[in-house]
């Protein structure tokens, strides 16, 4: 899947807060996905590049993001920060700059349109940024993100910038994703309990989704506790009275 397509789905998801609509949109997204990328898509929908329990953080604060955006779209850091204050969101500021530059620089727009990056390629670059360490880390992160942004359409730029900042607000939780996976592959939500059981054993939506898409619901049913993947804690049940506690 091209990341541009995922960006378009992000836009649709942002436009609604109704759970049934979110499930419908997500199920259509998942129908367009294959087994190799479905796990990555589930992480990206949560604003992540790995499960929540893994200490994989992109590690870029606003100042570094501003540097990367400025370098990608041929402006200066202060101009980026000013636009951010006007828009109230770094992603929107970056989208505006990308749109402005691609409108005036037709060769850049042609390059972006002719070779759109895939979801896997974008996820790989974000993981690369997250794994940088040691001397020169800041420059490596800024440079790599800048080069990535240059290759994306404006809508994709918006969402990629919001991911490291934790400002990707899609309103999608685990239950919504599980319902959508069942609907996409089975036509209804009846497989949700089986998917949820596997999720509870692994705390890893991407793993569950990939197993489901690659090997089917039978393989999901066989999911066991996995070393390194924590079990999700069960919610406490309310008792009728304090005496029964």
Range-by-range predicted roles:
Residues 1-245:
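N-terminal nucleic-acid-engaging modules of covalent nucleotidyltransferase systems
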């Amino acid at each position: 899947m091209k990341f541009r397509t995922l960006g378009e789905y992000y836009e649709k998801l942002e436009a609604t807060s109704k759970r049934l609509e979110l499930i419908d949109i997500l199920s259509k997204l998942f129908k367009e996905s294959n087994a190799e990328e479905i796990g990555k898509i589930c992480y990206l929908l949560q604003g992540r590049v790995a499960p929540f329990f893994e200490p994989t953080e992109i590690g870029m604060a606003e100042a570094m993001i501003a540097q990367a955006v400025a370098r990608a779209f041929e402006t200066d850091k202060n101009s980026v920060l000013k636009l951010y204050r006007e828009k109230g969101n770094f992603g929107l500021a970056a989208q505006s700059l990308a749109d402005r530059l691609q409108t005036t620089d037709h060769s850049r727009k042609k390059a972006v349109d002719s070779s759109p990056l895939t979801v896997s390629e974008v996820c790989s670059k974000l993981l690369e940024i997250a794994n940088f360490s040691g001397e020169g880390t800041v420059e490596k992160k800024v440079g790599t993100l800048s080069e990535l942004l240059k290759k994306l359409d404006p809508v994709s730029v918006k969402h990629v910038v919001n991911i490291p900042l934790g400002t990707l607000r899609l309103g999608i939780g685990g239950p919504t994703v599980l319902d959508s996976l069942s609907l996409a592959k089975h036509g209804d939500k009846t497989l949700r309990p089986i998917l949820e059981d596997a999720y509870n054993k692994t705390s890893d939506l991407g793993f569950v989704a990939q197993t489901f898409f690659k090997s089917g619901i039978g393989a999901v049913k066989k999911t066991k506790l996995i070393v390194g993947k924590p079990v999700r804690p069960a919610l406490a049940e309310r008792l009728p009275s304090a005496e029964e506690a």
